[in-house]
Amino acid sequence: LFNNAGIGSGAGLLNSSLDEWQRQWDVNLMSHVHAVRAVLPGMLERGEGYLLHTASMAGVLSSHGNLPYAVSKHAVVGLAEWLAFTYAHLGIRVSLLAPLAVRTPMLGDAADGEWANQAGGPIKEPVEVAQQVLNAITTERFLILTDSIAQTWMERKTADPDRWLHGMSRLQQRLEGVDDAGLPEN
């Protein structure tokens, strides 16, 4: 089963409605839950199966500017981890795809603009990501990262979470056009 659903709005905490939160939660997480509940009994009966979930680097490390998306993708990470350790001994394999940025309709025109520079690397083509996924599931690797910078970021976050959060705060200020003192940049 390949669970690959995701929508986003670019909203934060105070500028997103509860309806928008629910819509993203339903698509980004609950679609995975419903699909797994539909196929898992048959997989368990056969004693084998493979579940591939698409989250996002926003679900592994969080992201700027799209809080409902990041939170719902964090939940997908939790779901995939739980499924992996709960059902491994019963023949169920699980992988989690956490791409940074893939050229899909979800990115729209942003894939060619400033967002691409902020993403930390080039936008991946879908065929390139598909090959990475095939290579990873062949070896039954759980976490599939599509960009080498993502591994570096994860290592930095886990090595020193406080430093990571401080760096993310500074990046947020730059994205908002303010300096480290909170003053508008000229």
Question: What would you call each of these model-derived segments?
Answer:
Residues 14, 63-67:
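Active-site loop immediately N-terminal to the catalytic Tyr-X3-Lys motif
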Residues 12-13, 20-25:
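Substrate-binding pocket helix/loop in short-chain dehydrogenase/reductase
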Residues 11, 38-47:
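A short helix-coil junction within the Rossmann-fold of NAD(P)-dependent oxidoreductases
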Residues 85-152:
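SDR active-site lid
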Residues 56:
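Residue(s) in the substrate-gating loop at a strand-loop-helix junction
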Residues 36, 72:
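Active-site helix of classical SDR
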Residues 4-9:
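Conserved NAD(P)H cofactor-binding loop of Rossmann-fold oxidoreductase domains
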